[in-house]
């Protein structure tokens, strides 16, 4: 139990620390950050529930106003901004990534982590992120936000996919390295 709490806190800290790497703004409210890599790693290494709890801890820190997101952002307003869908999507992304690594025990861990990170960290996170971005842009909260189609919201997010595919590869390599040198630390397979 104590080990689980420690690792959940450690991965929450990793996600926060990755927010200190400067974000790359693209001009439409959703920056490129490394924090989604931390989400993928939390699921792949800790497993479904522990990975999701690490993400939930970070989301709680954001909600109470701590500036733990890339660019020093935090507060409840983040949950109604253009990145809200992605931030909300972190929870199921970590859970699904971990669940896939747990279930694909006969598959090499790097491949299982890559499949999990692709399904959880890209497909699920993007589905929620695009939907959230589209809803915010069509809510008319800001005068400069002209309504956009769901297809346009999807096209706007396309530049993020290559970078996230690199994060998938990194997740697989890190999971394989942990499995090779410290297998007891790969809780998703424990």
From Swiss-Prot:
Q: Which UniProt keywords apply?
A: Cell inner membrane, Cell membrane, Membrane, Transmembrane, Transmembrane helix, Transport
UniProt lists the gene as: bioY
One Pfam family linked to the record: BioY
Topology relative to the lipid bilayer, per the entry, is:
Multi-pass membrane protein
Molecular function (Gene Ontology), one example: biotin transmembrane transporter activity
A GO cellular-component term linked to this record: plasma membrane
What is the first-listed, main subcellular location in coarse terms? Answer: membrane
Organism, by scientific name, is Rhodobacter capsulatus (strain ATCC BAA-309 / NBRC 16581 / SB1003)
This protein's name: Biotin transporter BioY
The family annotation for this protein states:
Belongs to the BioY family.
> Any stretches that span the bilayer, and where are they?
8-28, 29-49, 51-71, 76-96, 115-135, 146-166
Task: Relate the assembly described in the record.
Answer: Part of a biotin transporter holocomplex composed of BioM, BioN and BioY. BioMN complexes can also be readily purified, but not BioMY nor BioNY complexes. BioY homodimers are also seen. Only the BioMNY complex has ATPase activity.
Function as written in the Swiss-Prot or TrEMBL entry: Central protein that confers the ability to take up biotin on E.coli; while biotin transport requires BioM at very low (pM) concentrations at higher (nM) concentrations expression of BioY alone suffices for uptake.
Q: Where in the cell is it found?
A: Cell inner membrane
């Amino acid at each position: 139990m104590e080990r689980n709490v420690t690792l959940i806190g450690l991965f929450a800290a990793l996600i926060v620390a990755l927010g200190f790497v400067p974000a790359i703004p693209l001009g439409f409210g959703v920056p490129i950050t490394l924090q989604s890599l931390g989400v993928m790693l939390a699921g792949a290494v800790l497993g479904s529930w522990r990975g999701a709890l690490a993400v939930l801890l970070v989301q709680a820190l954001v909600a109470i106003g701590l500036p733990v997101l890339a660019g020093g952002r935090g507060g409840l307003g983040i949950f109604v901004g253009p990145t809200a869908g992605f931030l909300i999507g972190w929870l199921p992304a970590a859970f699904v990534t971990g669940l896939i690594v747990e279930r694909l025990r006969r598959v090499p861990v790097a491949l299982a982590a890559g499949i999990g990170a692709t399904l959880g960290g890209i497909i699920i996170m993007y589905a929620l992120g695009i939907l959230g971005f589209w809803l915010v842009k069509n809510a008319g909260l800001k005068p400069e936000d002209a309504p956009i189609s769901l297809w346009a919201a999807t096209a706007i997010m396309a530049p993020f996919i290559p970078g996230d595919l690199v994060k998938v590869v990194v997740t697989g390599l890190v999971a394989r390295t942990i499995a090779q040198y410290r297998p007891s630390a790969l809780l998703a397979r424990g």
